[in-house]
Amino acid sequence: MARVSRLDPALSGVRTGLIIFDALNGYLHSDSAEKDAFLAERNIIPNMQRLLEGARKVGMTTFYPSGAHADDGSDTVLRLTDTDMDLGVGGSADKPIKPRFTKGSKAAEIAPEIAPIATDVVIPKRRWNSFHQTDLDLQLRARGIDTIIICGGSTDVGIASTLFGARDLDYGIVVASDACYSTRGDNNKFFMERVFPRMGRVMGVDACVALMTA
C-alpha cells in the first residue's frame, strides 16, 4: 500500500507552531549600540512582531525556547574550544566559557515587544538545541503540531542547532529568514542559502503570514 503524503504547503494554525528562539532582552536590547543598530537596520524586532501577530490571528500557538541558566554556571559544562563565540581566543582552564545571561535576570526576560500571552508556551532551555532535554517536543505533539516556523537568533548557533533537532524529529520546517539574525560575518547568509533550504523552506515574514491564511 502506498504511503499517504501529509505534506501541506499551507501553514495552518492547527498543525503549525511558531517558535521564537531566545528573544531575550539581553540579545534584542543589549548594551551594545553597534548590535542594537545592526538589529534595527534589519527590522528584526518589527519583523518578529509581524510574524507573531499573524500567528495569533489564526490561533497558532507560539513557543518561546529561552535560555535559563543557573547564576553560578552549575548547569553548564565547561569546555575547551579553539575560539570564543566571536572567533576570538577560545576557552581555557582559567577562562571558561559561561552562560551570558542567567535565570531571573532582566537580560534573561523575553523582550516586551514580543512577550508571550497566556496561551503561549515558554520553554526553559540550557543548551543550544531547544529540543534537548526540554518538553518542547511533547508540547508540540500534544497539540498535533507537525510543522514549525522559527525566528530569532543567533542563526548560526541556537537556530541551527534547534532546526537540526527538529529535522531529526521529523518536523516540517519553515525559517522566517528576515526575522532571524547573526552578527557574525556572513554566517546568516550561509545558513539561509546553503544549509536550511536542504532541511525545509526558507521565506520572509510576508510569505509566512500569507501561507497562514491560505
What are these regions (language model features)?
Residues M1-I117, M199, L211-A214:
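Active-site acidic carboxylates
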Residues K57-M60, G144, D170:
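Glycine-centered short loops/turns at secondary-structure junctions
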Residues T62, I173-V175, V202:
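Hydrophobic beta-strand scaffold residues
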Residues R100-I148:
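Internal catalytic-core helix/loop-beta-alpha segment
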Residues I123, G200-C208:
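Short acidic-hydrophobic, aromatic-tinged amphipathic segments that line or gate anion-handling sites
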Residues I149-G153, D170-G185:
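A short glycine-rich beta-strand->turn/loop micro-motif centered on a GG-aromatic cluster
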Residues D156-T162:
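Short glycine/serine/threonine-rich phosphate/pyrophosphate-binding segments
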Residues T183-F196:
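Active-site-proximal loop->helix
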